[in-house]
Curated annotation (Swiss-Prot):
Superkingdom of source: Bacteria
Bilayer-spanning residue ranges: 1-21
NCBIfam families: PRK02958.1 (NF002813), tatAE (TIGR01411)
BP-aspect Gene Ontology terms: protein transport by the Tat complex
Cellular component terms per the entry's GO annotation: TAT protein transport complex
Keyword annotations from UniProtKB, A to Z: Cell inner membrane, Cell membrane, Membrane, Protein transport, Translocation, Transmembrane, Transmembrane helix, Transport
Name of this protein: Sec-independent protein translocase protein TatA
Primary location recorded for the protein, binned into one broad class: membrane
Length: 74
């Protein structure tokens, strides 16, 4: 009673097709696919922005006195 066999699922699918029709189900499937695609693109663009923010390095000024001291020690 806890699990359904393949026949139960086929009967449910047949009833759903009869109630909604194949055109509505096709439209629903394409809408769902478009939503998933949009979600993936949004996540991908957010990841790319985060990566580019981490790769950005700030310019540093090297003090000439420290550089001269390092050369005089060698």
């Amino acid at each position: 009673m806890g699990s359904f066999s393949i026949w139960h699922w086929l009967i449910v699918l047949l009833i759903v097709v009869l109630v909604f029709g194949t055109k509505k189900l096709r439209n629903l499937g394409s809408d769902l696919g478009g939503a998933v695609k949009g979600f993936r693109e949004g996540v991908k663009s957010a990841d790319e922005e985060e990566i580019s923010a981490h790769n950005h390095t700030e310019a540093r000024i090297i003090d000439a006195d420290i550089k001269d001291k390092a050369q005089s020690k060698s």
